Regions:
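Transmembrane helix-loop junction
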Residues: 22, 50-51, 150-151, 184-185
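Internal transmembrane alpha-helices of multipass membrane proteins
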Residues: 60-69, 74-173, 202-205
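Hydrophobic residues within membrane-embedded alpha-helical segments of Major Facilitator Superfamily
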Residues: 10-13, 17-20, 81, 88, ...
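Juxtamembrane/interfacial segments at transmembrane-helix boundaries in multi-pass membrane proteins
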Residues: 51-69, 140, 174-220
Length: 220
């Protein structure tokens, strides 16, 4: 397996582990699986970063070549961010275990499954080279985060999760509208392709509105 073929597994490992984690009983096994998945993702991200220092890596899902297919395009910058995200996830888990035991005293599998989903979403946002997939991974991460907030024993946790859901939904809608406008103007969702086509359209009102929607959506 080449580094290019290995690179998507920094997102796929926590995504697959989340499905398994939801079924695990007790406290220890879900935590161990979550820590192992985060550590494995960090190792893969480190290997990817080392390879990306020599030039961008491109992985086309389903052998559909970009810009038609979905592309993972990894350069040194986003590979470093992926390593940072995965390393932080792995480092905080041992320290967070005591707090999780207090907040979720019973079966912790679903809690750690949601954590892994949120983590996988963040990794997907970092690595994808497709604008619509940024939206998809953002929604995966956001929905998992809403559920994590609602896990708190304090009754205010549900209200906080609901407020977060409303704000997140509005923000995601703005983001999707902005991406839709960009697609309407350029005919592509591939970020490299967008970067090549947008300079010719930068003074058009539609592109300016699209960027405004994206900025507001990400801000919310």
């Amino acid at each position: 397996m080449t580094v290019v073929e290995l690179s998507p597994f920094s997102m796929l490992v926590p995504l697959i582990a989340s499905a398994v984690c939801a079924l695990l009983p007790g406290r220890l096994w879900p935590w161990l699986l979550t820590f192992a998945a985060a550590a494995a993702s960090a190792v893969i991200a480190a290997i990817t970063l080392a390879a990306a220092m020599d030039g961008p890596l491109s992985y086309a899902f389903g052998n559909w070549e970009p810009p038609i297919g979905i592309e993972y395009r990894i350069d040194a910058a986003n590979a470093f961010v992926a390593l940072l995200v995965s390393a932080v996830a792995a480092v905080i888990l041992p320290w967070a275990k005591t707090s999780v035991d207090q907040e979720v005293p019973e079966r912790q599998g679903p809690f750690y499954a949601l954590f892994l989903l949120a983590f996988a979403g963040l990794m997907g946002i970092t690595l994808t080279g497709d604008a619509f997939n940024v939206f998809v991974f953002l929604e995966i991460s956001s929905l998992a985060t809403y559920a994590l907030i609602a896990h708190g024993q304090d009754r205010r946790a549900l209200l906080a999760a609901f407020r977060y859901l409303i704000m997140g939904t509005v923000g995601a809608t703005f983001l999707l509208i902005g991406i839709g406008f960009l697609y309407m103007m350029t005919g592509t969702l591939n970020m490299v392709d967008l970067a090549q086509r947008l300079p010719e359209l930068r003074d058009t009102a539609t592109v300016e509105v699209a960027l405004a929607f994206i900025v507001v959506g990400m801000g919310l």
